[in-house]
Structures are given as C-alpha cells and as structure tokens.
Design a protein with these regions (language model features):
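Short beta-strand elements in bilobed, periplasmic/extracellular small-molecule ligand-binding domains
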Residues: 214-217
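Thiamine diphosphate
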Residues: 1-160, 165
C-alpha cells in the first residue's frame, strides 16, 4: 500500500464509522479540507458543524454535545487546539466529557505549511490533563483501528495525526491495544522506542545501526 498521512486514514475511518455509530458528530474550525473531516461532512452534513476560526467555541460546544450524549470529534491543527488549553482543561478534562480532540499537522514534518503550524508541545500539554488519553498512531492500519477505539472509549481523548505520508509498519493482522507497545523488530544491543510519525524512521535507523559491529560478536 502506498504511503498515507494518518490524517487521511482518520478521515476515511471517521466516514465509515459514521454509518455504524449514529451518535458521532464532527466539529471543525475552518480546516476540514486539511484535517480530512470534510469526508464526514459531505456524507453526513446534518451531523457536521463548521465552527469557523473559533477553536475555543468549538471545544465548548463539543463538551456540551458530549454531555448531551453525543460522541463529538473536534478537529483542528494540533497547535491551534493547545492554544485553547484553558478551555480544554475546564470544559473537557475536569468534567470528564466524552470529547475526542483531533490534532493534525503534528511534529515538524508538515512541509510548506511552515513552523507556525507545527504541533510541538501538544503531547506534553495534553498528557498533563486529568482523564485524557493521548493516542498517536504510526500508520494507516493503526490509525483506522485507533479511531474506532476512540469512538467506543468513554472519556476525553487527544488523537495526534500527521500531514506527511507514512509507510505502513504494522502487519495486516495487527490489532490495536491502547497502552500496549508493539515489537516491530528483535535485537540484542540497542532498544529504540518510537511513536507516531517517527516509527518508520526509527526502523530505518535500526537498519543502519546493524551495519556497526556488535559488542557481542
């Protein structure tokens, strides 16, 4: 399968889940073509809310929808979501609202969008909040399974996605398990931990390290 950005995988998975779970609603802050929530918007226009460039209002509205029994996915660039950190903290985290925040354009690999759009501090900030789960899938397979897990999980979640295409690293029979690491390659000298968009690059780094003499050889 050709490389695919996890934001694209998210859009495809969300559109498919919309058929199965009718309580899913989606909100976006004028970036649906970039976050890929536009796929859901076109298929379910009555369950999609374009909030404009007003992330704070979007997050508060998502919290209200969650408290009313809906499953809201609120989407924007990761860097714009954390700019409304206090609203996330008070309206979502402290109330344990069942809101799914989706932050795209994570990390530095966002191409021509530039440094002002990079989500760099979001993992540290979102991990500090009570009740929140943070999920950063590494490829198409994991992303699609993670989106379904998130929809069924009760509680706030931050889903961190990439703009840049990623190669698949997980096998076709991969099964997503929250909080459980996956061993992609065995070895004995070096352990490399990675998450999200750098998993594939970490595997490449491991291949380069194999060319060096082992201390056990």
């Amino acid at each position: 399968m050709p490389a695919k950005a996890t934001r694209v995988s998210f859009g495809e998975a969300l559109e498919e889940l919309g058929e199965k779970i009718r309580d899913i609603v989606v909100l976006d802050a004028d970036l649906s073509k970039s976050t890929m929530s536009i796929k859901f918007a076109k298929k379910f226009p009555d369950r999609f809310f374009e909030m404009g460039i007003a992330e704070q209002n979007m997050i508060g509205t998502a919290a209200g929808l969650a408290l009313a029994g809906k499953i809201p996915f609120a989407c924007s660039f990761a860097c714009f979501l954390i700019g409304r950190y206090e609203t996330i903290r008070m309206s979502v985290a402290y109330t344990n609202a069942n809101v799914k925040l989706v932050g795209t354009h994570a990390g530095i690999g966002i191409g021509e969008d530039g440094y002002s759009q990079m989500g760099l501090e979001d993992i540290a900030l979102m991990r500090a909040l009570p009740n929140f789960s943070v999920i950063q899938p590494c490829d198409d397979i994991e992303t699609k399974q993670a989106v379904e897990y998130i929809a069924l999980h009760q509680g706030p979640v931050f889903l961190r996605l990439t703009r840049q295409p990623l190669e698949d690293v997980n096998p076709p029979d991969y099964k997503f398990q929250f909080g459980k690491g996956v061993i992609l390659k065995d070895g004995k000298d070096v352990t490399i931990f990675a998450t999200g968009g750098v998993v594939f690059n970490s595997l490449l780094a491991g291949e380069k390290l194999e060319k060096f003499p082992s201390q056990h050889s």
